[in-house]
């Protein structure tokens, strides 16, 4: 028996709804009414009347019920939402429309052809007024509530409305528009409740300001004066004899290509909104919809009137900021899900948040995700949807796939425009709405019909609802039509099959972002080009994303002033300043950018002959890297949000608020300053809602959207708000609770801060000195960080040792489940070397246990029973795990690294005393005098106080220092045996193929040298006579380091031992010798005598590499090579203890610290080839 398809499941669900859901069944479209309104030539007012009278007894519109609450202290009355909706029938709605039409026509307020501006959010009142205007033959001019008053004033001046209808919340702006426009004789106020003090005050204020120029009246007052019998026919009401070609609606664009322009909709085009099956394939089933799109957007009108023409019920969200969206969805249980991509993003965010919130120790994430999806389907979305559509902007392939999996049905993708209506459904030409189409060449962007494998060009169309032009803009209208009357969509498409298209680009450098905003990149480039730090700038966007990226070539003065790594922050600040001065919107400011130090010229092909940006070449040159940034920001955002939800409350509030804003908006935490406003960082109302939810999840504090988007509140103010509302105390230590903080800022930390009692309970500490020692014959080892480069070799080393004693290696691996943790670890050994994989599998079969956990979490992220088992059975803890990040501050690395070490210490001090092998970094030396930095010195003495700043790797080094301090404290408490291994560069081994630490600097260097085939005459400063100087490169092979850590760690059954795991020799083996060895091995590398010439050629060659190579090259770290290095002879710190211990234990093939030899360097090339990078 074949499996049931999605389509079959949908059909069964629809049948079940008809049988068991009375509301669904009662909303079925009436065939007779549908046929009546589909009659060709039926005027718009008659269509509306046919629907209203035909479905008179059905519920038409619905809004949230409210109650009025009076504050006992102030006496002020406000609204409170109730958890249910109240409806108005079609008949009642028609009575309201008729009464209002009677008043407006009788009093000559609105005549056929008059323009009426509407300012407010979609609601029962808004819909009533809008349909009344259609009945009267007037022209509706919906205004964008999100637009600034200065953007609306030109529209009012151009349309000269006789009336302005405004919600009470927008009344102040409407008053300004009425005063400046001077043509409106009436301001009609809707969504007004006379019981609410603020509403009455708003009306009184408007009446005072407009006294003598315009009448201010509420909708309720106007309808009450209407003199129309219930159920009256339209008859000969004004507007019934108006031509179908007469203007009925003006939809103003956002003005990205200049001043806002109004797309004209004649009555026949507006009528298509009421004939749902002409634009929506799901128009045959009952329509119960939740309406949240504004009426200034075509999609908002299609949803509302498509619902009514089907005899359905249109519900309205309770709040325009969509803060009640999920609550409203659950109450309404819509049959149609017509969302823009940003709302699908919100559903996905809700899913992720719920999964992260519930994910507990040992939980099966796959099963949990399936459960949460089911709950969202049934409890949030209502479980009775029969169609789903996304439109207004492109949706990413990844999001579409997730939505379809969530809904268990196909997600229809609609593509159209304000001017032409629906054009494509799922990429296919929408027939019969599209009468004709064609692609035309766009030579200036490099798109041609002769392109292979598919023709590419701008899509031009003729449709049955094509607009006649822009209001009072004849020249602009002429520009958007060709000589044959085809409308230029401005969209570049590839025709991948007969009448099947894929969107590629915007012709006029106008991008529509995923939230529906248009941005003109050429205008933005001109604005940002005014920055004194910017020489050239290329703005890049993807319509599936909500924000922009950029590539910036700084001025030479800017490059000379500060290092490149410091320049990014300055450039970011400059862009913000220029944007503020130019009055740009937040979405017009690039969220991230690449710094390019080589100017674009005619010679390198990145400028055109008239010195304009060569956009196709720039996109080809940077496009994949920029798309990777989008991907990285998205992935990083998910990881950071998960981290914030799990441990954000443990950090200082300001730090977490900044991190949360950066994570939510896709930025870098280091670039977010406390004085930044959320909207300045690219936030809007939807993302502000997500921010509200995130802060609540982190702090259990409600921060209203209004507080977040208020111009008076920067991130510091938001943090202050949280601080004021937050209950004191925390169940886990935090950076602030351990090191103290002043307004979240710490400039130095002290070893004395890191006392064990701040991390470990008193009972454990009191018992520790009396505990027995672990078994000196190590049979059970706990290893962290096993998937890391060093960690995997430690895992292999300890598996081999456990094989000799029939012991067990327990690896703690970050993953959703133990199964996924094991899979992660297995994958690290599957590098293309079958012998390695077989060796690992043979050992792992009997001696490996993998647990999903995290050293930075409470109880290591394990259930209590498992944690106690480890406390009882583990003989040795080997801890190379760390969050290695050379940019994040100590405050952000405190949790995973310092607190993580404390969590392992608590395990080490429970049940029995377990020796602890700790991998540190030689970087802890950066704040210690060289003479004091020895292997036997107490870190608490030689580095009692450390600076906390933004210098390179400051946070990472401090976090490892903190771990060493805690280990010293534990040793003093109970004699905990400790071995600390301070490592420098860890190089590849010579045994196993394909095992490389691809992201590290050294691997990038070898790949870049081999791929470009050029190297400098010397990487080091030359001697006075121009000769190469003797130099030493400090690195050791990973196999040797793993053996040393394992051997010396196992031997450390008492005492505290510190080892500098470094290459101490003044052997004249450095980077120059590595190049010699590569040449001798048959990897040709040309020497460029002048270092500057080499660097320039090297960078150019790296940028020309194929994407995968370029991404793994030295390019992102090239700033470290701007000048030749100063040669170092020998190691930077003493290694006497380490070398003596190695010699005594006979570690390694030389029974001594090894030199770096040619086989190691040459093997890098063969391994890179094996991995497909060379």
From Swiss-Prot:
Domain Carrier intervals: 651-726
Annotated thermal dependence: Displays in vitro half-lives of 73, 70, and 48 hours at 26, 30, and 37 degrees Celsius, respectively, indicating it is a relatively stable enzyme.
Cofactor remark: Binds 1 phosphopantetheine covalently.
Binding site for AMP: 297, 392, 413-414, 418, 491, 503-506, 512, 612
Catalytic function, reaction form: a carboxylate + ATP + NADPH + H(+) = an aldehyde + AMP + diphosphate + NADP(+)
Enzyme class: oxidoreductase
Purpose: Catalyzes the ATP- and NADPH-dependent reduction of carboxylic acids to the corresponding aldehydes. Catalyzes the reduction of a wide range of aliphatic fatty acids (C6-C18) into their corresponding aldehydes. Can also reduce benzoate to benzaldehyde. Has a preference for NADPH over NADH as the electron donor.
Record-given protein name: Carboxylic acid reductase
Source organism (scientific name): Mycobacterium marinum (strain ATCC BAA-535 / M)
